Amino acid sequence: MRPGDIFLAKLARKPAPRCGIGSATSVVTTDLMDAVQVAFPHAHLDAESMARLAAAGHTVLGFDNVMPLFSVWHESAAMGCEVDWGGKNQWPNGQPMYSSVDDAILVPPDLLKRPGCAVPLKALGLLQQMMNGQVAVVGKVFGPWTLGYHVFGIEAFLMASLLEPDAVKRAMRKLIEVTVAFANAQIDCGAEAITLADHCTRDLCSPETYRDFLLEIHQELQQRIRCPVILHICGNTADRLQYIRETGLACFHFDSKVSAAEARRLAGEKLALMGGTSNFDIVRNGTLESIEKDIVEKLNVGIDIVGPECAVPLDAPYKNLRTLVDVAKKLSGDPPATDQISKPHET
């Protein structure tokens, strides 16, 4: 099977000759930018640069998928948020555009033609050509809870969820249309799966809030997005996995704050699991021994797609990601062609 076929099979919890190896979020590091001579912020703003940098997820790192939307701000920028696109060592950041959840949300009729959306849409098409069907091309959108943070500001949005819950729900009904439109446009441009990132982690959203505000929203997104959907939520999500498994979404990309064994138990048999490898302990500071131990743990409990827990830190050495890929292939029955595992970065 081609790497992309393995990735998509594992999203559906179907048999494959080895585990999937990939990430629903960014795997870009500063030394990976150096390796392919493409850097932020240009790779956020130019489709060809974005596609070249995303392709390195396979051509340099060896992952089974590529994902070109490195930032969290693309659709929010297209909505009208002012965004500082950062630099090589700095992630983008943006400013809210409304002062109250009661403000009327205006979705621009040309949303998908604005650079925030148009650039990654073009990059997805370029990636499909570059990868030639060998690996899975994955898109990424943000759910209406996170878009609420962006357009209203985190503090204002969270306070409103307590004091004006009906207004928040009305706002989310409007913002869900942005998520759906951008997701399905990405599919039309070549995405074979979509990451749905929604920052409803424990410190910002209680499990009851997830149940009351987000469960139905995520169920609806599963129905309206026309491909397998990978939900990504940072942090310890053990207290809401019982609800996440009710969404019908294909896969959950989980944080190392939930142990792999607990995540597998709580997810049940239908929900595929991806990730769970610590960015700090393994991706940034791992040794061959610690990487092997981590992958063995994931494989023993049935994690479908191994890889980083979240967007990789920019200062992590990409060689550790390459080592993770080689170890995962060797331990799950598909050793590297040279039978030589890449050595992790030595500090």
Where would I find each of the regions flagged by the language model?
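Intrinsic-disorder/low-complexity, polar/charged segments
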Residues: 45-48, 97-102, 114, 166, ...
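Glycine-rich, N-terminal phosphate-binding loop and its surrounding beta-alpha-beta segment
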Residues: 53-81
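Active-site loop segments of alpha/beta catalytic cores
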Residues: 1-31, 109-347
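Pocket-flanking alpha-helical
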Residues: 33, 77-80, 127
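A contiguous, low-structure linker/loop signature
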Residues: 71-110, 134
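Generic internal hydrophobic packing segments that stabilize the cores of diverse globular domains
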Residues: 51-55, 63, 117-124
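Active-site-flanking structural segment that lines cofactor/substrate pockets
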Residues: 29-61
